[in-house]
From Swiss-Prot:
A GO BP entry: histidyl-tRNA aminoacylation
Source organism of this protein record: Nitrosococcus oceani (strain ATCC 19707 / BCRC 17464 / JCM 30415 / NCIMB 11848 / C-107)
Protein name listed in UniProt: ATP phosphoribosyltransferase regulatory subunit
Gene3D superfamilies registered for this protein in UniProt: Bira Bifunctional Protein, Domain 2
MF annotations from Gene Ontology: histidine-tRNA ligase activity
Keyword Chloroplast appears in the UniProt entry: no
Length: 397
């Protein structure tokens, strides 16, 4: 193998160099502190699990995204997590088992077999928060507000919301009496907004004209708040009233607490349909087609772990947030400390580090590049006193 090929990383797999890594670590700390201030406890699930545990209660999409390997100790199949959300649901249902509301947050690397979108990463750093044990719009709103505040504290601005409710499609499917295979086929057609294909498929399955019209209407029920009023008329008598009421309540509360955040509604958008059960949302910024944060309600996932409970949450890619963020926070540069055995040198270095300063030793017989070391000051002994002098004032750098 040529030595140059040893430098290559797999396609879609990236690494962070010092500046980017420091920015990401700063963002990580800010987010964990934010989640803590809202009452969310940090959990750290394992990177790999037995495959049946990792994929329980999720759809085939996640299974296709999961790298699989054989455990050399047991011979059982294991998977490298592609999504931390199911792991946190397992922890909440099996390990913690609180009687009231449980709030958990997490951050960690995930691995995807394929990148999501052109030029996308296959090794995101997923960060998110989950709330268990409450099914009302209050918890939907809390999670939504926390997601938007998380974007704000890492410098992602000009966010607008896209809201939907997968319960509308699910309720219509039940009335149409479709099989799981037919439901999946209809789901794929709906994502393409192909009205004629929807009509043809449902006619072939003897679905009545009124219900066919409702399914086709989902392709065009998108826009501002007026869409919800239109949906009440178009979908009247279909049993989706509760879902529309939830959307209206969340929209009203969002207007109250986040009046400057634009909202868009799309009743045909079924993001995360395989495990979401109710309200779903995504956050977008101008000039970017992919969501920077997404979440929603997934009340059924705890049942497969032996404890059914309401659940809602969100997730985002920390590496992407750092790239997109416009935070003005700057890194304080360090102090260069040429190696010395003079009295008080080590004591002064220790004191500076305890104060939070970055102090970098300069070794004898080496050339020091202050920019590479990240230093703009130097520790100097003058008049038997250790002083901090700006490097530019010393005529260096």
């Amino acid at each position: 193998m040529p030595i140059t090929e040893r430098w290559l990383l797999p396609e879609g797999v990236g690494e962070l160099l010092p500046i980017e890594a420091e920015q990401m670590e700063r963002a990580r700390r800010v987010l964990i502190d934010l989640f803590h201030s809202w009452g969310y406890d940090l959990v750290v699930p394992p990177l790999i699990e037995y495959l049946e545990s990792l994929l329980t209660g999720v759809g085939t999409d996640l299974e296709l995204q999961t790298f699989k390997l054989t455990d050399q100790l047991t011979g059982r199949l294991m998977g490298v997590r592609a999504d931390i959300t199911p792991q946190v649901a397992r922890i909440a249902a099996h390990c913690i088992q609180r009687k009231g509301v449980t709030r958990l947050c997490y951050i960690g690397s995930v691995l995807h077999t394929l990148s999501q979108g052109l030029g996308g990463t296959r090794n995101p750093i997923q960060v998110g928060a989950e709330l268990y044990g409450h099914s009302g719009t209050e918890s939907d709103l809390e999670v939504l507000r926390l997601a938007l505040e998380a974007l704000d504290v890492v410098g992602v601005k000009q966010v607008h919301l896209d809201l939907g409710h997968v319960g509308i499609f699910r309720d219509l499917v039940l009335q149409a009496n479709l099989s799981p295979e037919e439901e999946y086929g209809l789901f794929n057609i709906l994502q393409r907004k192909a009205r004629d294909e929807i009509d043809t498929m449902l006619r072939n399955r003897d679905v009545g004209p009124q219900l066919r019209h409702m399914f086709m209407a989902l392709t065009s029920l998108n826009g501002g708040r007026e869409v919800l009023d239109e949906a009440e008329q178009v979908l009247a008598g279909s049993g989706v009233e509760q879902a529309l009421t939830t959307l209206k309540e969340v929209a009203t509360l969002t207007d109250k607490y986040l009046p400057r955040v634009p909202m868009h509604f799309d009743l045909g958008e079924l993001r995360g349909y395989r495990y979401h059960t109710g309200l779903v949302f995504a956050a977008y910024i101008p000039g970017r087609g992919q969501a920077v944060a997404q979440g929603g309600r997934y009340d059924d996932i705890g049942q497969v772990f032996g404890r059914a409970q309401p659940a809602t949450g969100f997730s985002m890619d920390l590496k992407e947030l750092v790239t997109l963020g416009s935070s003005t926070t700057t890194t304080r540069l360090g102090i260069f400390a040429p190696w010395s055995e003079a009295p008080g040198f080590e004591r002064e270095v220790a004191r500076l580090r305890q104060q939070g300063e970055r102090v970098v030793y300069g070794f004898p017989d080496t050339v020091s590049n202050y920019d590479e070391l990240g230093c703009d000051r130097e520790l100097v002994l003058k008049a038997k006193q250790w002083q901090i002098i700006e490097i530019r004032k010393l005529g260096r750098g």
